[in-house]
C-alpha cells in the first residue's frame, strides 16, 4: 500500500514537472517564433544573413567580442544622415586651388564690369545734363527774342496811336486783348477825330437855344462900337475869356433840367435841391 502510494506520488510529481515544463515552453516559444537567428562564428563577428539595418560591407559590430581575437576595439557604425568628412587629397587640393583662382578671377571681372558700368552711367548722365542745359538755354533765348519783338511792335503801335490831333492816348494793350486789328483801330481813330471836330465847331448845339441866342447877341455887342467909340482890344480879349464860363453855365443848366423841379429851390443866384432826388 505504501509502495503503491509512493508510486502514485512519483507519477504525479513527474506529471506535474512535465506539465510545468510544457507550459513554460509553450509560453516562451510563441513569443520567439518571429525571432531572427543569429549565428556567431568563432571570431565573434555577425554574419550578413538578414535584410535588417545591420548590413555592412566590411566588418560587423562585435557584439560578443572574443578574448582570443587580436582585435579588441569596437567599430562604430557611421551615421548615414551626416555628410562624410572631406579628405584632403592631392586631387581635391588641386581642384580647390582652381576653384579659388576661378572665384578670384570672377570677382575681379565683376569689379571691372561694375566700374565700367559706373563710368558709362556717369558719361550718360553728363550728356543728358548738358543736353537739357542747352535746350533750356535755347528756349530762354527764344523767349527773350520773342518778348523783345513783341515789345517793339507794341511801342510802335502805341506811338502811332498817341500821335493824333485829338490828343487822346489809346493803349494798344487793350485793343490787342479785345482782338482789334489795325483796320479797326484806324476806324476808331477816324471816329474820335470827327467827333472832336464836331464838338469844337458846334458846342452850342448841345445847350439850350436861349443860351445860343444870348451868346450871339453878346458877340454882336462886343464887335459893334458903343456910342461910336472904338472898344479897347484888351476889353474884347477879357470878354472872350468869359465865354468858357458861359458854356459851363449852360452845361450846369442842362444838368439841372433833369432834376425834379419840386426838389430844387432857387434863392437869389443859388440853386438848392434835396439829396434824395440825386440818389
Curated annotation (Swiss-Prot):
Q: What induces it?
A: Induced by far-red (FR) and blue (B) lights, as well as transiently following transition from darkness to red light (R) in a phyB-independent manner; responses to red and far-red lights depend on phyA, and responses to blue light rely on both phyA and cryptochromes. In the dark, binds to COP1 and undergo degradation through the 26S proteasome pathway.
Loss of this gene results in the following: Reduced seed germination in red (R) light; this phenotype is reversed in plants lacking PIF1. Reduced PIF1 degradation in response to red light pulse. Hypersensitivity to gravity stimulus and increased greening. Increased hypocotyl growth independently of far-red (FR) pulse at light-off, as the result of a rapid loss of active phyB due to increased dark reversion. Highly unstable phyB-containing photobodies in plants lacking both PCH1 and PCHL.
The protein's matches in InterPro entries, at most eight in alphabetical order, are given as: PCH1 (IPR037476)
Q: Can you supply a Gene Ontology BP term from the record?
A: response to blue light
Q: Does the keyword Transmembrane apply?
A: no
Q: Does the keyword Nucleus apply?
A: yes
The alphabetical list of record keywords is: Nucleus, Ubl conjugation
> Post-translational modification, briefly?
Ubiquitinated by COP1 in darkness; this leads to proteasomal degradation.
Tissue-by-tissue expression: Mainly expressed in cotyledons, hypocotyls, leaves.
User: Per the record, what is one GO cellular component?
Assistant: nucleus
How is the subunit organization of this protein annotated in UniProt? Interacts with light-activated phyB. Binds directly to PIF1 and COP1.
Question: Which named protein is this?
Answer: Protein PHOTOPERIODIC CONTROL OF HYPOCOTYL 1-LIKE
Amino acid at each position: 500500500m505504501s509502495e503503491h502510494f509512493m508510486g502514485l506520488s512519483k507519477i504525479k510529481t513527474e506529471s506535474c514537472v512535465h506539465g510545468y515544463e510544457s507550459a513554460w515552453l509553450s509560453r516562451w516559444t510563441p513569443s520567439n517564433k518571429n525571432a531572427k537567428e543569429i549565428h556567431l562564428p568563432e571570431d565573434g563577428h555577425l554574419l550578413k544573413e538578414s535584410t535588417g539595418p545591420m548590413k555592412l560591407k566590411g566588418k560587423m559590430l562585435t557584439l560578443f567580442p572574443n578574448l582570443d581575437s587580436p582585435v579588441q576595439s569596437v567599430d562604430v557604425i557611421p551615421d548615414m544622415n551626416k555628410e562624410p568628412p572631406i579628405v584632403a587629397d592631392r586631387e581635391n587640393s588641386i581642384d580647390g586651388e582652381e576653384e579659388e583662382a576661378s572665384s578670384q578671377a570672377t570677382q575681379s571681372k565683376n569689379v571691372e564690369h561694375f566700374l565700367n558700368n559706373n563710368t558709362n552711367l556717369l558719361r550718360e548722365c553728363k550728356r543728358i545734363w548738358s543736353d537739357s542745359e542747352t535746350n533750356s538755354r535755347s528756349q530762354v533765348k527764344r523767349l527773350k527774342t520773342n518778348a523783345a519783338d513783341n515789345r517793339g511792335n507794341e511801342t510802335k503801335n502805341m506811338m502811332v496811336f498817341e500821335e493824333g490831333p485829338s490828343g487822346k492816348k489809346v493803349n494798344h494793350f487793350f485793343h490787342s486783348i479785345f482782338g482789334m486789328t489795325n483796320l479797326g483801330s484806324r476806324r476808331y481813330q477816324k471816329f474820335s477825330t470827327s467827333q472832336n471836330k464836331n464838338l469844337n465847331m458846334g458846342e452850342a448845339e448841345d445847350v439850350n437855344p436861349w443860351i445860343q441866342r444870348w451868346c450871339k447877341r453878346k458877340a454882336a455887342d462886343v464887335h459893334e462900337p458903343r456910342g461910336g467909340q472904338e472898344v479897347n482890344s484888351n476889353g474884347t480879349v477879357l470878354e472872350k475869356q468869359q465865354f468858357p464860363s458861359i458854356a459851363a453855365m449852360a452845361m450846369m443848366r442842362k444838368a439841372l433840367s433833369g432834376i425834379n423841379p419840386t426838389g430844387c429851390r432857387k434863392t437869389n443866384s443859388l440853386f438848392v435841391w434835396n439829396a434824395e432826388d440825386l440818389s
